[in-house]
From Swiss-Prot:
Subunit structure: Homotetramer.
Protein source organism: Myxococcus xanthus (strain DK1622)
Described purpose of this protein according to its UniProt entry: Heme-dependent dioxygenase that catalyzes the oxidative cleavage of the L-tryptophan (L-Trp) pyrrole ring and converts L-tryptophan to N-formyl-L-kynurenine. Catalyzes the oxidative cleavage of the indole moiety.
EC identifiers of the protein: 1.13.11.11
UniProt key word Iron: yes
UniProt name for this protein: Tryptophan 2,3-dioxygenase
Length: 291
């Protein structure tokens, strides 16, 4: 017979004596994690906790994003595109978490934020080393972006390593070259620290792949995964800009930037320019013979 409503008895096998065992809190180090939300406003402002958690959770998702993009790069280096497609599916969900959670911060009104904004000092999202790592992994290389991290040698060193290494897009072009596609040598071996310069020859490589997708299915699928990734990244940038505009208008950013104006310029940046340009070059396929 069913038991009383709103009551669920513990099953006999559920462990309740946790002395000497690894617990949920132990495994996740919740004592450290949950003690990291330290407000600075005096007296503590109710909404400062929201602001801190918004950014800390973003950093956690970016840590996972870096982990997954690194795995993608290793698969591409090994000429194994297919296993990377599953990772891209996960990357898609991580990115959605990142840009959809801006809606939580948007519940912060301008006057509420102004009541504790001064406690941020000169801190700014531009100083997020993990965000910078994601940009480097995807190919947006800018030596000036390393400057805010010079005072932390370990972080600066890791970012410098990514800055000097081929990006995901670079590795994909190198893979296509190994597969026999006529990628220009200037895009197979170059100074990876320099900003990427798009090439009409690379557009032509992609045009051939798109015009005969069945013959180049893995490469075609990879092209679309990269476009998906960049589109979602642009959505993140846009939501960031709109959230800032909604909360502070056109005030200067805490880190010294112009604020919304600086964020708007990022919308013009492209990670994979030829994958966007090729869409203009595509023509209708020839009619298929029907028996």
């Amino acid at each position: 017979m069913p038991g009383p409503m709103n009551k669920r008895d513990l099953e006999p096998g559920i462990i309740t004596d946790l002395a000497g065992r690894t617990t949920y809190g132990d495994y996740l180090q919740l004592d450290r994690l949950l003690s990291a939300q330290v407000t600075r406003s005096q007296p503590p402002h109710h909404d400062e906790l929201l602001f801190i958690i918004q950014h800390q959770t973003s950093e956690l998702w970016m840590k996972l994003l870096i982990h997954e993009l690194g795995a993608c790069i290793r698969y591409v280096q090994a000429d194994r595109l297919e296993p990377s497609f599953k990772i891209f599916a996960r990357v898609a969900h991580i990115q959605r978490m990142l840009f959809e959670q801006w809606s939580v911060l948007e519940t912060l009104t301008p006057n509420e934020y102004l009541e504790f904004r001064d406690t941020l000092g000169s801190s700014s999202g531009f100083q997020s080393f993990q965000y910078r790592a994601v940009e480097f992994l995807l190919g947006n290389k800018d030596a000036q972006a390393l400057m805010p991290f010079r005072h932390v040698p370990a972080i600066h060193g890791e970012l410098e390593r990514l800055f000097e290494s081929p990006s995901l897009y670079d590795e994909f072009l190198r893979h296509l070259s190994r597969m026999g596609h006529p990628v220009p040598q200037s895009h197979v071996q170059r100074d990876w620290r320099k900003p990427y310069e798009k090439s009409p020859e690379v557009v032509e490589v992609f045009r051939r792949i798109y015009q005969d997708a069945e013959a180049h299915w893995d490469a075609y699928e990879m092209c679309e995964k990269l476009v998906d990734t960049e589109e979602r990244f642009q959505l993140w940038r846009y939501r960031h800009m709109m959230t800032v505009m909604r909360i502070i208008g056109f005030k200067q950013g805490t880190g010294g930037s112009s604020g919304v104006g600086f964020l708007r310029k990022a919308l013009d940046l492209r990670f994979f320019p030829e994958l966007w340009d090729v869409r203009t070059e595509l023509t209708p396929p020839p009619p298929r013979h029907r028996p």
